[in-house]
Amino acid sequence: MLSSTAAVAGSDFDADGDIDLFVGGRVVPGQYPKAPQSYLLQNNGGTFTDVTKEICRSLQTVGMVTAALWTDFNNDYQPDLIVVGELMKISVYQNTGTGLTDITDPAGLAQSAGMWNSITSGDFDRDGDMDYVVGNIGQNTPFKATPEHPLKLHYADFDQNGATDPVFSIYEEGEYYPLASLDLLTAQMPVLKKKVLRYKDFAQSTTSDILNILETGEMQTLQCDIQATVLLENLGTGQFKLHPLPQLAQAAPVKGIVCEDLDLDGDPDIILTGNEYNTEVVTGRYDALMGLVLRNEGGLRFHPLSSEASGLQISGDQRAAVILRKADDEMALLVSTNGGAARAYALPRSGQKLLAFEPGEVSALLTYEGGHQRKIECHFGGGYLSQSTRSLRLSPQAKEAVFYDNNGNPTRTLNILALKAEL
């Protein structure tokens, strides 16, 4: 593989009993924002073969991938694929049994382009299918992007020097204007020094005015329609609906996401980590997220907890967030930071037995007192090349757990009430 990659997700997509891989390309060095190559790698007895062209040709250049998730969104017991990235739509690929088909636009996600960083799954509305939390850049930024007036990124070798030149453009008062300063643009494209002589002229120039000076014959454009970190509701009909998470979740880019039933009420809550320190000097750091817990209150409503109530107060340039099983059969949250130490936080003690997924098991259906059910998936690969433990943390209301393999066959049924009696 000759690609600078950032995401790896595993699943048995050919149903032969071993783990195959999707490897997402992140960037072409020196050619930002050209799409790098991504790969579907088929596991043939420990040897991996690139089958991207045969399975889904469009995945080769899907975009600048930051995260991917194998997930059964339509409950047909075949692993589908969702891919997110920078200036990409939330890209949904349905497993047809013979290949992967891009259903992004028909699924209602035609205007979902964002600066996406991360994704994970959870059944948040008790309807037996998987919903998703998708981490974005947030709304605490110098620019504002909407589907009606998206942030745009035009790119080409505008000055014909062999390097790709990106030009970000924002909408203000009926026109698009360059986001970068004149100094930054002329450093990138010195030809502009002879064309735009005064700062006053640049201040009055639209993006079209600047591009008209340059060679735009091979220009391409990407865009960002939405900045918010969202809950992606699975409507169960091959359609999805975006719900922005509460305002505190929009304070900074979201990088790490954990879905876990923290208060043991049978509904998954959300833990978010993030920030971004690698920014332009004129922009400043995105550093307003200290870790955030969103309590699931039902009806796709989430209540942000204060740091005093949640116990989370994480400084730094946060990246992955995972749940690990401790030696005392309880669980902990582990958060990595860019250039810093990892942070560990004990989850509230459950006093319940943890149930481990066995090899070959990919999902479980929990039944609770009162009759409602919740589906849980166990993934191979998470955000920033991380992975949570393959164990279930049970609430006191759980009665039964049915585990399933990759083909939808139930592998075992556990009477949780009986297990509790043994403790």
Where are the regions that the model predicts?
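Gly/Ser/Thr/Pro-enriched helix-cap/hinge segments flanking short amphipathic alpha-helices
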Residues: 56, 101, 139-152, 161, ...
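Asp-box/WD-like beta-propeller blade repeats and closely related beta-sheet repeat scaffolds
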Residues: 1-13, 35-36, 51-57
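Extended catalytic-interface subdomain
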Residues: 151-209, 213
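Beta-propeller domains
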Residues: 54-97, 109-116, 199-203, 208-266, ...
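Structural signal for beta-propeller blades
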Residues: 30-31, 37-40, 89-92, 229, ...
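Glycine-aliphatic tripeptides that mark coil-to-beta-strand junctions in extracellular
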Residues: 17-23, 77-79, 128-134, 162-170, ...
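Beta-propeller blade termini
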Residues: 5-15, 19, 65-75, 79, ...
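Surface-exposed loop and turn segments in beta-propeller and other repeat-based domains
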Residues: 53-59, 106-110, 169-195, 230, ...
